[in-house]
Amino acid sequence: MKILGRWLKLLLLGLIGLFLVWQLWLLGWVLLWGWVNPGETRFMAIRLAELRQKVPEAQLKQQWVPYERISIHLKRAIIAAEDAKFVDHEGFDWEGIQKAMEKNQKKGRFVAGGSTISQQLAKNLFLTPTKSYFRKVEEAIITLMLENLWSKKRIFEVYLNVIEWGNGVFGAEAAARHYYNTSAAQLGPEQAARLAGMVPNPRYYDRNRSAQGLGRKTAIILARMPAADVP
């Protein structure tokens, strides 16, 4: 029994050690990407692998642009649509999380997540789309790293450049060119609001650009944009 207990203790210490090494590895990338633009996120790599199963030579559409070359309308639209308290919270919108939990409980299934921009970025940079308790814990840890080591402006800049906006389309510049044949800097208010409305389900809206639901979301986002605070 003592031998078994000793082995269990060693196993536990080993798992803790691996967990800490993993966190240090993540921390290293977070520190680097605070100054260097990410080339490819974990989520982008997953989507590219999926595309290449059907088309081996497939490539993602993505072009990095500095924060200053992204339309203020798109910045306001994303804040209005995804995270109205972004500039004020420290990574987590507890009120939004509570509302999402109540909505899920009422529906009896998962229909809302309540994730902030920082949480969404943490998932996109490092994690897989699979849902698990470990993944939620990891997401929270990475979110805290981002919030404490990056400025809000840097978080938002990276987010706008790496989020999915269609089938193989990532980032504001690629989205602007894919849908409107213009640059991210030249997006108007309605174009920006429509792009922001696509964020929760971009591949669906890429296929169904005239969806009625998207039109309603666009109108709501447009109405909220003047009150949106951007970093």
Swiss-Prot record:
Record key words, sorted: Cell inner membrane, Cell membrane, Cell shape, Cell wall biogenesis/degradation, Glycosyltransferase, Membrane, Peptidoglycan synthesis, Transferase, Transmembrane, Transmembrane helix
GO cellular component entries: peptidoglycan-based cell wall; plasma membrane
Record field: transmembrane: 10-30
Main location as per UniProt: membrane
Short name of one Pfam family: Transgly
Gene Ontology MF term list: pentosyltransferase activity; peptidoglycan glycosyltransferase activity
EC number in record: 2.4.99.28
Name of protein: Biosynthetic peptidoglycan transglycosylase
HAMAP family in the record: PGT_MtgA
Family from the record: Belongs to the glycosyltransferase 51 family.
Reactions that this protein is recorded to catalyse: [GlcNAc-(1->4)-Mur2Ac(oyl-L-Ala-gamma-D-Glu-L-Lys-D-Ala-D-Ala)](n)-di-trans,octa-cis-undecaprenyl diphosphate + beta-D-GlcNAc-(1->4)-Mur2Ac(oyl-L-Ala-gamma-D-Glu-L-Lys-D-Ala-D-Ala)-di-trans,octa-cis-undecaprenyl diphosphate = [GlcNAc-(1->4)-Mur2Ac(oyl-L-Ala-gamma-D-Glu-L-Lys-D-Ala-D-Ala)](n+1)-di-trans,octa-cis-undecaprenyl diphosphate + di-trans,octa-cis-undecaprenyl diphosphate + H(+)
Domain of life according to the entry: Bacteria
